[in-house]
Amino acid sequence: MRQRRHLIILLFALTATLPSMGQNGINSPFSQYGIGASHLPFNMPAASALGGVVYSRSASNMVNPFNPASYGAVASETLVFDMGLNIEMSTLRDKANSQYDADGNIGYLAVAFPLTKWWKTSLGVMPVSEVSYQSTLTSGINPGGEVKTIYEGTGGVSRFFWGHGFNILGGTDPTKTQLRAGFNINFLYGSLTRAVTYDFVANDTTYFMDSRRQKDTYVKNIIFDLGMQYEQPIGEKYRLMAGVTLTPSRKMNVLDNALVYTFVTQAGSEYMRDTIFPVDGDSEFESSLEQPFTTGIGLAFQRNDKWLVAFDATLSPWNGLKYAENSTYSVFGQSPIRYDKNTRLALGFQLLGDRNSAKYVRRMTFSLGTHYEKGCLKLQLTDGNDYRLDEWGIAFGVSMPMRKGRSVLNITAGYTSYGTVDLLRRDTFTFGISVGSCESWFVKRKFN
């Protein structure tokens, strides 16, 4: 009992570190819109290895927050601790230039345990999105000189979830038909800072003064998602699995703090001079971001202890939705971004390990996955063209059993390509490692 309490205290202590870890990420100009760029579900190495397949997946030594029904697969009298780490190496490129960057972070932390034989619960935290970019545009001005326009942003949004999974049919017996349902209560929290700085370098500074437009956004919202999973044995060798998730649409309110001002730089330090906005001294106002109704569907077919093939589809109609500033003053002016329908398709294949084999290599599971995502962002640029930002990727992973197969170590390597070289493309190599530990924590020991 004391060990369980210490583990849960550790989870909550590490929760506070996640937002700060997400604020030193890879330079990504794509993250300047909305609440930033999201890497879900690829921040979870076990999911990334299968191309992002998550909706039909469940295991006794894994926490799958992307379908809360999966918590029902947690065995009685056990506690599951799941943690993942990721390292990214990314290159931004267009037709003429390229830039390399690298970063590492905690992908997620989660625990799951039974409340009764049919009711299981999970607690966890993971980053949802990240804002991390800096770029400079230099242009000439008259009379003589130039102006540097610096775009920069930092921050991120994290998700703390409390999930519940219920065994409706079959319990955790793999020889029986199983039906599970569940839901997550998700608390989104975080802060985002975006700024545009105009740095004038002119022969005559009488007509020019450095200025900055800055907006801090604070996110605190609660959202819900629902899930179901169904597993059906087919004969003695095969098994069909299906999963579905629903995330209801929601208008998320955020608090913005905006400031537009001029400044002077002396001896390397900045000093504010004149405030352009707000004129009345109140820089805070509420804004809103609409989240669409999102549907996830997954199917998997397995030959017991041999192989598994799985497919996922995610549908999010972002088209028509927008980020609404409830202010009479537009801090950054008209955005060139437009939201489009978002579709993500994932396909994965596994060679399953034989848990009874005497050779360790044969007990290992090997995964291969790929995904394609029709992005929700579409840029409308001054050349009159629309650029939709799509993504595709491929990944490979290996799962190595520990402690007689009850716990597992997952190692994943993957590649993704996002955007287009005609505008800007990000090529990323990702390496992930996660540990899923399943321990007997609720058994009363008997002593003679």
Give a label for each model feature.
Residues 1-8:
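Bacterial N-terminal signal peptides that target proteins for export
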Residues 17-19:
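N-terminal signal peptide c-region/cleavage motif recognized by signal peptidases
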Residues 23-448:
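Subset of outer-membrane beta-barrel
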